[in-house]
Amino acid sequence: MNSILSSVLPAPEDPVLSVIFACRDDPSPVKLNLSAGTYRTEEGKPLVLDVVRRAEQQLANDLDKEYLPLNGLPEFNKLSTKLILGDDSPALKENRVVTTQCLSGTGSLRVGAEFLATHNKESVIFVPNPTWGNHPRIFTLAGLSVQYFRYYDPKSRGLDFKGMLEDLGAAPPGAIVVLQACAHNPTGVDPTFEQWEKIRRLVRSKSLLPFFDSAYQGFASGSLDADAQAVRMFVADGGECLIAQSYAKNMGLYGERIGSLTIVCTSEDVAKKVENQVLLVVRPMYLTPPIHGASIVATILKNSDMYNDWTIELKGMADRIISMRQQLYAALEARGTPGDWSHIIKHIGMFTFTGLSEEQVRLMAKEYHIYMTYDGRISMASLSSKTVPQLADAIHAVVTRIA
């Protein structure tokens, strides 16, 4: 009998999952996984925010399990839009914003990509080099042609701002540009406010369409407003943009898959047409989104006491990550580790490019049981005061051994 499925080829190795599996299979009691993008406490445990537990307790008696509308929970959409754009956003006042609840950041990006592939005449999308590993796959599968613009400078371990402007300046009018709103993944390198303004001017002068990935609002600096600054700058000029939001990191709702796609249009009339077309994308994809995560977020955002408590817990997470950066830098300096490690405290958010080579990274795993992606990215949120010395010792050893 002929087998249709026997001709299926093996899938290519996922660079992040392969590291996670290697760490899982390592029997060492001191193994350390710095590859996954999830927050951990000082004790190395997953964190459920107290305010999330309170919201769930409140919902336990009130929540039904009916289908949501295609565009999701209306209350969630309204509150989520205000969170990213600000209460006083002119785009909101002029009713030219469309928000659709989606399946976290990934789902929001995919719905936006499918919409753009159908309705944007220029099908090329520019993403940073490097960028989150899932970005190219999401956009390619949606039918967009992915190209890259320079972003990270390995020599300075900072932003290649000149290269970025040159590449975006050469992009064709109408091209889509993916911009991470804050806490760039995987590098931890963000533009300054002044650099963002120059990026905005270039994007608008070239008639490019910005698509923001906002996965870490409040998780980078500890301030929800500061981390939305770049997005609001683009919205304030009256132009168009798309924004994918996620509550996986800033509310710890990883498994609830809760996010939203917001599309800022030039007029209310355009927004109405865009809304209907987005729903045509959603309907055959998953029909309606889940209710539980959206209800948690809406409960927290609409209650002033809960919102306040959330901002305190959120700042606590951001501050702990900043502290891990400071401790790691100090530990490397104390050991006299060769090289300049100041980029660790200059970077922001969950991730940092260490600057380690693939050879050094593999040695870290083999001899020191410390796992990170092969490009040298580590999750600062997975470190603790107890494991910083362990990491610093290993980095010092491999850098000294392999120049």
UniProtKB/Swiss-Prot annotation:
It catalyses: L-aspartate + 2-oxoglutarate = oxaloacetate + L-glutamate. Homodimer. Important for the metabolism of amino acids and Krebs-cycle related organic acids. In plants, it is involved in nitrogen metabolism and in aspects of carbon and energy metabolism. This is Aspartate aminotransferase, cytoplasmic isozyme 2. GO terms for molecular function: L-aspartate:2-oxoglutarate aminotransferase activity; pyridoxal phosphate binding. CDD domains: AAT_like (cd00609). The keyword Cytoplasm applies. GO terms for biological process: 2-oxoglutarate metabolic process; aspartate metabolic process; biosynthetic process; glutamate metabolic process. It is found in: Cytoplasm. It is an enzyme of class 2 (transferase). The modification N-acetylmethionine is found at residue 1. Its cofactor is pyridoxal 5'-phosphate. PANTHER family: ASPARTATE AMINOTRANSFERASE, ASPARTATE AMINOTRANSFERASE, CYTOPLASMIC ISOZYME 2. The modification N6-(pyridoxal phosphate)lysine is found at residue 249.
